């Protein structure tokens, strides 16, 4: 019987470097002979990528917090069904750039105090947590500058400004403190290679 893979998520505010660290961890696992699946949220599966464009592009006030929450949950459900669960069942590790914790922080803590509804929808439609979560922490002033400098067109959340990013950082740190069994806070305000080495060291300890 195939041993299920691990679901490993990377979380943090926009511009924190979590996407880079997710990619570097996937490369490390490939170098050690594993076959990880690197994915992202919102998105990952074709249907979820369609929803992603609705969420990350356009005017900051395009959606109400409630509508935004439903869109994120729909994207995550499709991602889980079509990509994450099949890969885990094959014994592959899945590394995802964001998962449910982002919804808890973005929609639950900063976009209308919807945390109870976030948790209810997660229980009904998703029903699982990552095995390990890396929260890449960075001063919001620096992260916001980096995020806007990308000019990717996917900057709807960055456009909410510094107070929003500051609230997000506090939300992620609170969430990590509340879930010490699976969450590891990593100082992202260092050279990329140092951050990656720290991630790998914690992964080895948790294995």
Swiss-Prot record:
Q: What is its EC number?
A: 2.7.4.9
TM spans, by residue? none
In its UniProt entry, the species of origin is given as Dinoroseobacter shibae (strain DSM 16493 / NCIMB 14021 / DFL 12)
Give the UniProt entry's GO cellular component terms: cytosol
Q: What is this protein called?
A: Thymidylate kinase
Supply the CDD domains for this chain. Answer: TMPK
| NCBIfam families found in the cross-reference section | DTMP_kinase
Give the record's keywords alphabetically: ATP-binding, Kinase, Nucleotide biosynthesis, Nucleotide-binding, Transferase
Q: Name one GO biological process term.
A: dUDP biosynthetic process
Instruction: Name the domain of life.
Output: Bacteria
Segments carrying the region annotation (Disordered) are 11-49
What's its job?
Phosphorylation of dTMP to form dTDP in both de novo and salvage pathways of dTTP synthesis.
- Reactions catalysed, as given in the entry: dTMP + ATP = dTDP + ADP
GO terms assigned for molecular function? ATP binding; dTMP kinase activity
In which family does this protein belong, per the annotation? Answer: Belongs to the thymidylate kinase family.
Q: Where does ATP bind?
A: 12-19
- Look at the named UniProt entry and state the broad enzyme category this protein falls under: transferase
Q: Which Pfam families does the entry mention?
A: Thymidylate_kin (PF02223)
Which SUPFAM superfamilies does its entry note? Answer: P-loop containing nucleoside triphosphate hydrolases
Report biased composition (Basic and acidic residues) as residue ranges: 24-38
């Amino acid at each position: 019987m195939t041993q299920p893979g691990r679901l490993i998520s990377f979380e943090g505010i926009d511009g924190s470097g979590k996407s880079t660290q997710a990619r570097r961890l996937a490369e490390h696992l490939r170098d050690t002979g594993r076959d990880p699946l690197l994915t992202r949220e919102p998105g990952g599966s074709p249907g979820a990528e369609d929803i992603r464009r609705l969420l990350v592009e356009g005017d900051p006030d395009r959606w109400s917090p409630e509508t935004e929450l439903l869109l994120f949950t729909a994207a995550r459900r499709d991602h889980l069904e079509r990509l994450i669960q099949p890969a885990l069942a094959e014994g592959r590790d899945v590394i995802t750039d964001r998962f449910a914790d982002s919804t808890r922080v973005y929609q639950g803590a900063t976009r209308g105090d919807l945390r109870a509804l976030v948790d209810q929808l997660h229980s009904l439609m998703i029903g699982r947590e990552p095995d390990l979560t890396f929260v890449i922490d960075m001063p919001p002033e620096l992260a916001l500058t980096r995020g806007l400098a990308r000019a990717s067109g996917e900057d709807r959340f960055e456009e909410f400004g510094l107070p929003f990013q500051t609230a997000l950082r506090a939300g992620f740190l609170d969430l990590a403190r509340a879930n010490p069994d699976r969450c590891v806070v990593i100082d992202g305000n260092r050279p990329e290679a140092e951050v990656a080495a720290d991630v790998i060291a914690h992964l080895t300890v948790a294995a």
